[in-house]
Amino acid sequence: MTVSLARLERQLGYTFKDQELMVLALTHRSFAGRNNERLEFLGDAILNFVAGEALFERFPQAREGQLSRLRARLVKGETLAVLARGFGLGEYLRLGSGELKSGGFRRESILADALEALIGAIYLDAGMEAAKERVTAWLTSEIESLTLVDTNKDPKTRLQEFLQSRGCELPRYEVVDIQGEPHCRVFFVECEITLLNEKSRGQGVSRRIAEQVAAAAALIALGVENGHD
């Protein structure tokens, strides 16, 4: 074990039995050989479960849609990158030369992905309880700062935060039709996102309202909300 990895383990609050798992979790796809993408996939699933369970227990009166919105905030890339920077994770990443030169060790998405990969690695190294304990410890202050007021956001904001938490492109809104007289127009808007094969649609007496309706429809189509929250 190198001194640097031992230092990172102290920051994480976890000592790996299998050091190769830790090294793999820190290996970006730009680096030659095996990379951390599979561990990231596993860690993402564990993170969502642990965060969901913690929110379920903290907010017993919250509706499903509220819990989903809180979890999206909790596991979004920005939150994970802040945690990763707190651990000094960037200096331990194994990056290809091009990614290294372009400052990949500072990039939000790379840091967030590596942290998820470490969660997956801890799970494989010591099981679910160990992974759950570390994730809960890392997120405790963030969870405690959340309130149900955080769910009282408009659909466009909720959709944007959900997509950002998944590392997806932001939605694109387009006015496809305007009907009616100038004093009583109705705007028709389509919302396009990469996770859906079909565009969601909305209409309203202003472009802003139509976009909000389209965003709400997209959230329902994604299964994030059920239309009754």
From Swiss-Prot:
Q: Does the keyword Cell membrane apply?
A: no
Classification via Pfam families: dsrm (PF00035), Ribonucleas_3_3 (PF14622)
One cellular component term (GO) for this entry is:
cytoplasm
Q: Name one GO molecular function term.
A: double-stranded RNA binding
Q: Where does it live in the cell?
A: Cytoplasm
- Which of UniProt's keywords are assigned here? Cytoplasm, Endonuclease, Hydrolase, Magnesium, Metal-binding, mRNA processing, Nuclease, RNA-binding, rRNA processing, rRNA-binding, tRNA processing
Domain RNase III per the UniProt entry, residue ranges: 5-127
Give me the reactions it catalyses: Endonucleolytic cleavage to 5'-phosphomonoester
Q: What is the top-level taxon of the source organism?
A: Bacteria
Which cofactors, by name? Answer: Mg(2+)
**Signal sequence, renumbered to the chain:** none
Keyword Coiled coil tagged: no
Which parts of the sequence belong to the DRBM domain?
154-224
Q: Per its database record, what is this protein's job?
A: Digests double-stranded RNA. Involved in the processing of primary rRNA transcript to yield the immediate precursors to the large and small rRNAs (23S and 16S). Processes some mRNAs, and tRNAs when they are encoded in the rRNA operon. Processes pre-crRNA and tracrRNA of type II CRISPR loci if present in the organism.
Q: What is this protein called?
A: Ribonuclease 3
Q: What organism does the record attribute this protein to?
A: Pseudomonas fluorescens (strain SBW25)
Gene from which this protein is expressed: rnc
